[in-house]
Swiss-Prot record:
It is a multi-pass membrane protein. Belongs to the UPF0756 family. One of its GO terms (cellular component) is plasma membrane. Keywords: Cell membrane, Membrane, Transmembrane, Transmembrane helix. This is UPF0756 membrane protein APL_0366. The chain crosses the membrane at residues 12-34, 52-72, 82-102, 123-143. It comes from Actinobacillus pleuropneumoniae serotype 5b (strain L20). Disulfide bonds: none annotated. InterPro entries: UPF0756_TM.
Length: 150
């Protein structure tokens, strides 16, 4: 096995460094896994990850969000609790974010060149500002509103 030194592997090493410096496990682990996949016999699975990675990530994120309800750590609110203004605002915020994410998926598919800028912005937010990497879809949705696409 020989290591591939290319701009992408260097980029992944930089991400790992930023993740460690920024104390962000998500970016560190993701970049490390992708570097290992790229540099080993697992590279044959990169097209699969490219095609299905976003969907798999959304499924895993959804499982993480729903698991406290399923485990009983968080109970489902009663109907009267849904009428609380904070709960209604939370529902509206959830609807808005889901809508933005949908617009973002359309924009990312229709204008793949913009994905690079969205990823760089997300990486900066994750590595340096303590954010989490759920931003590209929402960022793409916001961008679609700003540029009138999607």
């Amino acid at each position: 096995m020989s290591l591939q030194f290319n701009p992408i592997s260097l980029f992944l090493v930089v991400l790992i460094f930023l993740g460690v410096v920024g104390n962000n496990n998500s970016i560190t682990i993701a970049a490390t896994v992708l570097l290992l996949v790229q540099q080993t016999f697992l590279s044959k699975y990169l097209p699969f990850l490219d095609k299905h990675g976003l969907s798999i990530g959304i499924i895993i994120l959804t499982i993480g969000v729903l698991s406290p309800i399923v485990s009983g750590k968080i109970s489902l609110p009663s109907f009267s609790e849904f009428l609380n203004w904070k709960m209604l605002l939370a529902v509206v915020a959830g609807i808005a974010v889901a809508w933005l994410g949908g617009r973002g998926v359309s924009l990312m598919g229709g204008q793949p060149l913009l994905v690079t800028g969205l990823l760089v912005g997300t990486i900066i937010g994750v590595a340096l500002l303590g954010g989490v990497p759920v931003g590209p879809l929402i960022a793409a949705g916001i961008l679609s509103l700003l540029i009138g696409k999607g």
